[in-house]
Regions:
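Sec-dependent signal peptide recognition
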Residues: 1-7
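Hydrophobic h-region of N-terminal signal peptides that target proteins for export
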Residues: 7-16
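Exported/periplasmic cell-wall-interacting domains
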Residues: 18-59, 213-294
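SH3/SH3-like beta-barrel superfamily modules
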Residues: 19-70, 111-146
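Non-catalytic extracellular/periplasmic "stalk"
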Residues: 74-156
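Short, surface-exposed secondary-structure edge patches
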Residues: 107-112, 195, 279-282
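Short, flexible surface segments
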Residues: 115, 200-201, 285-286
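Gly/Pro-biased beta-strand-loop elements
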Residues: 124, 143-250
């Protein structure tokens, strides 16, 4: 078990690992605890972050082969309904999901897995693999076409997105020390169907990067409304990106005073554009973890 205490507000000392602040991006940096509005405060949830890092260390030691499940835009096939329903008992929707089967029943999926989720690969068979999800209980059988193996089981880049406090942390693991690289405000996805949804909780792999991610006008299948710069995708259509630019404007926008306030995005995580560029340049596809927490 990794334990820590705050030392002079500068570093977190651990008995098995260490978290230290050594920023590589230092614009719009937030304090460990900071004022929000007139009467409330927000914070970086270091205890919760430490718990996840502790769990990750155990996960990596327990399972030699890691990977992630993927079905962006249903590229690997839309999964079957669960008892006629398009959402599972945990609230995970069918769209762009991965079918999770009980090992003793491969006829109908029992749950849906979220695109990009971190998993351990326990056993491989001709058509299915037995996996253990990092973010949910149980072992599951998954059709092999939805599963991607990762070459290493020792992650050294992590991003924590906090929906409750509307902030983000980026971290590098150097030897046994996790270095905090940035601490910044964001806005996450809001619950406003049918076009907006909360950024889903879970642990994901960075899967894709786009210098400019084009987005459509709500309700349209072909009208481009604008673009989001330095977009890094981690699950379904959820990206970390800079401030959106609505056409006819084309030049990038650096900052919005709405960052760090309330959820406002469709599902994405909106950053200052220079911070989005930092994440875009710093992160590694299939090698960077994204933890979405509350």
């Amino acid at each position: 078990m990794i334990k820590f205490f705050l030392l002079l507000g500068l570093s977190l000392i651990l008995n098995a690992a260490q978290i230290e602040k050594e920023l590589l991006y230092n614009k719009y940096t937030l304090k460990d605890q900071y004022s929000y509005g007139k009467k409330s405060t927000r914070q970086f949830q270091w205890e919760k972050i430490n718990t996840y890092l502790d769990k990750l260390e155990d996960f990596e030691k327990t399972y030699p082969t890691l990977g992630f499940v993927a079905n962006y835009k249903n590229i690997n096939g839309s999964p079957a309904l669960i008892n006629g329903e398009t959402i599972d008992s945990d609230g995970v929707p069918r769209n762009q999901a991965i079918p999770l089967y009980n090992p003793n029943n491969l006829s109908t999926p029992a749950k849906y897995g979220r695109d990009g989720s971190l998993v351990a690969i326990i056993s491989r068979y001709e058509q299915f693999s037995l996996i253990k999800s990092f973010s949910r209980d149980g072992e599951w059988m998954v059709p092999n076409r939805y599963l991607d193996e990762i070459s290493s089981n020792d992650f050294n880049k992590a991003i924590f997105i906090d929906r409750k406090n509307q902030n983000i942390v980026t971290m590098d693991k150097i030897n046994e020390t996790w270095k905090v690289r940035s601490m910044n405000p964001v806005t996450t996805g809001r619950n406003h169907p049918p076009f907006s949804a909360p950024t889903p909780l879970g642990t994901y792999i960075v899967q894709e990067k786009k210098y400019k991610m084009l987005y459509l006008k709500d309700g349209s299948s072909d009208i481009i409304e604008g673009y989001s710069p330095y977009a890094v995708r981690f699950t379904r259509g959820a990206y970390m990106h800079g401030i959106p630019v609505n056409l006819p404007r084309t030049e990038m926008i650096e900052y919005s005073p709405l960052l760090g306030t309330e959820p406002r995005s469709h599902m994405c995580v909106r950053n200052a554009t220079s911070h989005a560029k930092f994440i875009y340049d710093w992160s590694r596809i299939n090698q960077t973890l994204v933890f979405v927490i509350d």
